[in-house]
Amino acid sequence: AYQPIVDLRDQSVFAHEALVRGVAGEGALTVLDQVTEDNRYRFDQLCRTRAIEGAANLNMQTHLSINFMPNAVYRPESCIRSTLEAAKKHNFPIDRLIFETLESEHVDNYRHLTNILREYREFGFKTAIDDFGAGYSGLNLLADFQPDLIKLDMALIRDVDQDRVRQAIVRGIVTICAELDVTVIAEGIESAGERDFLADCGIFLMQGYWFAKPAFKALAQVSPEAWTR
């Protein structure tokens, strides 16, 4: 499935995030419960190649954001090779691929993770830290590696327009990222109030049900009402 990430500046779609779904449309948790140590690498590779294939078949003209599992990547160059082959096969531009890693995912070796991210960047992929603020390691990871993008966790976003503590945290993250030249994406937007507060903070890339739900094997349309302030 694909969910749009919108750009409020010109009311366009900046990217689509590829989300895991089962063959019958089962949710991500149902699918991920079947992932084991034995099939983790194969699953990770299959997800990224299927995401690229699906995007090409849908004639996606935006960036494509793909989640990857750091613990499934043993040799970054092997994963990159298969990704490059998939992109070439389906004629999808390399510079429109974004790879997201979950800040909340337990990673045993952070040097390994930062090496993966650096190698991805060297090959022309954009990098992102997903669910930023959900775990305890986000700032440490940001200190070691500055991705192109971070995605604020929806727990920070929920009712942020009514919560002074969350507002202060979000403003602080935006300030830090501005100094580091890291673009902020707010995910999990579910209300006009959340959208408006975040826009006033200078966040222009957003994702969430307020704009569009994920579409299975399709590109979701953003309702015109979603933009109106």
Where are each of the predicted segments found?
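Generic structural signal for well-ordered alpha-helices
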Residues: 48-52, 80-87, 114-117, 170, ...
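Short beta-strand/loop segments at the ligand-binding rim of alpha/beta enzyme cores
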Residues: 116-129, 177-185
